[in-house]
């Protein structure tokens, strides 16, 4: 993959001073532009993720029509001299190759690498994080930059000195305390002084900003979207069938209801556009409303092939932005009106959830319970402000005071309501902050109020025992993914495809998406991917194989079956582009869940920085708690481990099962400097 030092051409032939070896600013190592980046990989890499030209993990992988995968640069360089596939020697043209799926890119991005400045920095991170590490966090790269700047300044002053006869002494404080007198880090003390930039732009050396794919792939500063407002953007793609490069969570079978972006993948269409971020909510696709539809329906709509994609999205407000959003006085005046509700008896509930906000005083309607008195009346909306109840002023009141007034009001409840003159978005989430259980931005007013299906009825699991007879050396004929500690997360082993003409394809009972629990009496549920693959291959040598698997079925309502699949996924069990649905993971039994602890810390009494939905009071069912948004500039955001769609199953060791929403939010707020969240993280659906 790389070249040896004797193949390197000196960059500065006439330089009076030797230079530090120029390094690539993406991988931190020395290589030519026509070659791949170099990484110090940690741990074993699955053979399926290795390029069989350079024998290194894939970079910018390309799939050939004959079913093989190689690095973009390796294959391009090979086909400049040859016209056949390196493996099966079938005729091949570079233009017929296409980018591998986002799932493959995601697995490769999560490979662990060691920092190239290992003498002073022993950090191990995911491959996709190395560039940011070198730029922002690595002490070795930082020292190198400081040394370069010092030497460049010294060289400039030497030139000035030769012209003017003056002498300039380096100002104090040029070097950081950790830098020794030579200006180099310990690992570089044997190197000569530098006169080149750390990340050189000299011809012949790697500078990703000027690679042939740079115009499409480089994302410098994301274009900002207005916060707390519904915005419509257009996404353009030259190939209408290429994936968007995002993963999504949510859907009306979960408390999230809306579709939320969990991750934006590098090199994807959305990443190149640069405007959408993780946590943004997608409300419409090409004017089709997906704000209250099932997860797989929304996924199918987003997967429709088109060159121009029109997305209506909502980004949550950060702290304090609402109060100042109309400081110029241009905000429309609130509409104030009366709503009189008649209860059948004094004990009947109105079906209204009331909350306070962090950035405005008073009491606000968070949600209307489906089938409740207020929802049947139809005049109240989420985000309405309650100014008074039966004449009691609540402009600076609390939800608790409002609830007491309603309970004591008898059969007539007269509400004085203020509603923004221009419809504002509203949301069913609560901020796990330091002040109140409020939302910073809300779902659109055209959303059906907070109704979602029971998840247990949407996803079903059926265990099956299968005995397959085969020739002793015949392959089982399936590909699998997952495994404990896998790059996609703590997933069980699951079937990704069943190639035709194989043993299992003839049998017909193992399907794509099945979770493998056991083979020939050997448990697979706690094995890593490589361990499980080795076990499957060893068991395949037997003339008969006994498989125990779990078939996960996502049940769509019969009336919506046709409507909710405008672009049905291929039923071919050998579809290389298939990836599992996020909802599929939610339906797995608890024995297959893998929990991990995330400790958040803060030095001030601000917000933890995430909003939650779910809990016992959602539709009077026991729904899990989901993270809906993560707010920029907060402990959760800077920690980086929490994702939208994560399930919170315990707080400081206390289980959240059966806990109400109104009980969990204050518990989170009461934690002062540290909180331990036990979460289950499932990867979102790729689109």
Swiss-Prot record:
PROSITE patterns for the chain: PDZ, ZF_RING_1, ZF_RING_2
GO MF entries: identical protein binding; PDZ domain binding; zinc ion binding
Domain PDZ span(s) in chain numbering: 232-317, 338-421, 465-551, 597-685
Zinc finger (RING-type): 51-89
CDD domains reported in the protein's UniProt record: mRING-HC-C3HC3D_LNX2, PDZ1_LNX1_2-like, PDZ2_LNX1_2-like, PDZ3_LNX1_2-like, PDZ4_LNX1_2-like
Region (Disordered): 145-175, 417-454
Keyword match Zinc: yes
Cited InterPro entries: PDZ, PDZ_scaffold, PDZ_sf, Znf_RING, Znf_RING/FYVE/PHD, Znf_RING_CS
Gene Ontology annotations of biological process type: neural precursor cell proliferation; neuron differentiation
Compositional bias per record (Polar residues), positions renumbered to this chain: 154-167, 424-445
Gene Ontology, cellular component aspect: plasma membrane
Motif (NPXY motif): 207-210
Keyword annotations: Metal-binding, Repeat, Zinc, Zinc-finger
Tissue: Widely expressed.
Comment field on protein domains: The NPXY motif is required for the interaction with the PID domain of NUMB. It is however not sufficient.
Oligomeric and partner information: Interacts with the phosphotyrosine interaction domain of NUMB.
UniProt name for this protein: Ligand of Numb protein X 2
Organism ancestry: Eukaryota, Metazoa, Chordata, Craniata, Vertebrata
């Amino acid at each position: 993959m790389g070249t040896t030092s004797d193949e390197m051409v000196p960059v500065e032939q006439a330089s009076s001073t030797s230079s530090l070896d120029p390094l690539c600013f993406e991988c931190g190592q020395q290589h030519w532009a026509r070659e791949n980046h170099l990484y110090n990989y940690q741990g074993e890499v699955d053979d399926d993720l290795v390029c069989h030209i350079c024998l290194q993990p894939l970079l910018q992988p390309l799939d050939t029509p004959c079913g093989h995968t190689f690095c973009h640069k390796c294959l391009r360089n090979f086909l400049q001299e040859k016209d056949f596939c390196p493996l099966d020697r079938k005729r091949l043209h570079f233009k017929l190759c296409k980018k591998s799926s986002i799932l493959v890119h995601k697995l490769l991005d999560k490979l662990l690498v060691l920092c190239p400045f290992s003498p002073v920095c022993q950090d191990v991170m995911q491959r996709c994080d190395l560039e940011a590490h070198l730029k922002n966090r690595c002490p070795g790269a930082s020292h190198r930059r400081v040394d370069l700047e010092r030497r460049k300044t010294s060289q400039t002053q030497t030139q000035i000195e030769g012209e003017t006869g003056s002498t300039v002494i380096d100002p104090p404080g040029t070097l950081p305390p950790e830098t020794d007198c030579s200006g180099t880090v310990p690992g570089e003390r044997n190197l000569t002084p530098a006169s080149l930039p750390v990340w050189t732009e000299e011809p012949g050396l790697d500078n990703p900003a000027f690679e042939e794919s740079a115009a499409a792939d480089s994302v410098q500063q994301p274009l900002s979207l207005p916060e707390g407002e519904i915005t419509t953007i257009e996404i353009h793609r030259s190939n209408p069938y290429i994936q968007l490069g995002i993963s999504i969570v949510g859907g009306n079978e979960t408390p999230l209801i809306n579709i939320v972006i969990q991750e934006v993948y590098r090199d994807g269409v959305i990443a190149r556009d640069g405007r959408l971020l993780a946590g943004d909510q997608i409300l419409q696709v090409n004017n089709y409303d997906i704000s209250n539809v099932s997860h797989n329906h929304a996924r199918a709509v987003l997967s429709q092939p088109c060159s121009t994609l029109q997305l209506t999205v909502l980004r949550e407000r950060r702290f304090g932005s609402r109060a100042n959003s109309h400081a110029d006085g241009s905000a429309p005046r609130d509409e104030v009106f009366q709503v009189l509700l008649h209860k059948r008896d004094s004990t009947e509930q109105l079906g209204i959830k009331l909350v306070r906000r962090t950035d405005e005083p008073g009491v606000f309607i968070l949600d209307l319970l489906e089938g409740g008195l207020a929802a049947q009346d139809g005049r109240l909306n989420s985000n309405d402000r309650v100014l008074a109840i039966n004449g009691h002023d609540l402009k600076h009141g609390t939800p608790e005071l409002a609830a007491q007034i309603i309970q004591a009001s008898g059969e007539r409840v007269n509400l004085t309501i203020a509603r923004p003159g221009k419809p504002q978005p509203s949301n069913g989430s609560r901020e796990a902050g330091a002040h109140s259980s409020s939302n910073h931005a809300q779902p659109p007013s055209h959303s059906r109020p907070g109704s979602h299906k029971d998840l247990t009825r949407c996803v079903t699991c059926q265990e099956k025992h299968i005995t397959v007879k085969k020739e002793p050396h015949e392959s089982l004929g399936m590909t699998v993914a997952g495994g404990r500690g896998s790059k996609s997360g703590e997933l069980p082993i699951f079937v990704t495809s069943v190639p035709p003409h194989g043993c299992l394809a003839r049998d017909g009972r193992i399907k794509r998406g099945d979770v493998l629990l056991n083979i020939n009496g050997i448990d697979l549920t706690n094995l890593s991917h490589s361990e499980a693959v080795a076990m499957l291959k060893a068991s395949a040598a037997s003339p008969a194989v006994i498989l125990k698997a779990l078939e996960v079925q996502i049940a769509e309502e019969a009336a919506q079956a046709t409507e909710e699949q405008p672009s049905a996924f291929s039923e071919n069990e050998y579809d290389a582009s298939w990836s599992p649905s996020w909802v599929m993971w939610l339906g797995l039994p608890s024995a297959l869940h893998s929990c991990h602890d995330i400790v958040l810390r803060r030095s001030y009494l601000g917000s933890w920085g995430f909003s939650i939905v779910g809990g016992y009071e959602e539709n009077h069912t026991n729904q899990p708690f989901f993270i809906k948004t993560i707010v920029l500039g907060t402990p959760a955001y800077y920690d980086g481990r929490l994702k939208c769609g994560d399930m919170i199953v315990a707080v400081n060791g206390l289980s959240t099962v059966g806990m109400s929403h109104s009980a969990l939010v204050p518990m989170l707020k009461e934690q002062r400097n540290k909180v331990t969240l036990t979460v289950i993280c499932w990867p979102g659906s790729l689109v």
